Amino acid sequence: LKIKRNESFRYHFDEPITGEFYLVKEGRRTPAGLMEIHNISPSGIAIATPLKLPIDRSTSIVVEFSLLLGSEPLNVSGQILHEKWTEAQRLYGVRLDTTKEDQQRIIEAIKQIVKEKP
C-alpha cells in the first residue's frame, strides 16, 4: 500500500480536532459518526475513529469540521484511501475533493492556528 504523504503542505495537530463524518453509497447516507483529525493538507486529511469504514471506490465519505473555534464548518466529500490501526482506533487517510475555495480556507485556518500557538 503506497501512502502519498509528500504533499507540499501537511499540518499535524498537537491535539486532534473533533468533527463528524458520514458515508454515502448509491445515494444512501449513513448516520453521522465522530472523528478526530490528526493531520490535514489542502487536499487530504487523516482521521481516527473506532468505527470500521469500508475502503471502496463506490463509497464516499463526507467530513464536517471547524479548524477554528466559532468558524463556519467545512463540509467536504472525499475517498478513503487507506486504513491503519492505532491503539483503540483506526486511522484513515482520506483524499478530499476540495475546491480552490475550500483549499484556501484550510490554508488560512492553519496559518491562524500556527500564529496562535504559544
List each language-model region with its residue ranges.
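Short beta-strand-centered aromatic/proline hotspots
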Residues: 35, 76-81
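Short solvent-exposed strand/turn elements
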Residues: 51-55, 91-111
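Short strand-loop-strand
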Residues: 25-58, 62, 93-95
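Residue-level preference for beta-strand/loop junctions
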Residues: 13, 29, 57-59, 72, ...
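Short, conserved beta-turn/loop elements at beta-strand boundaries and strand-helix junctions
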Residues: 42, 84-88
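Extended Gly/Ser/Thr-rich low-complexity repeat segments
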Residues: 56-66, 104-117
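Short conserved beta-strand and strand-loop elements enriched in small hydrophobics
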Residues: 17-24, 58-73
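N-terminal helix initiation/capping motif
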Residues: 1-40, 111-118
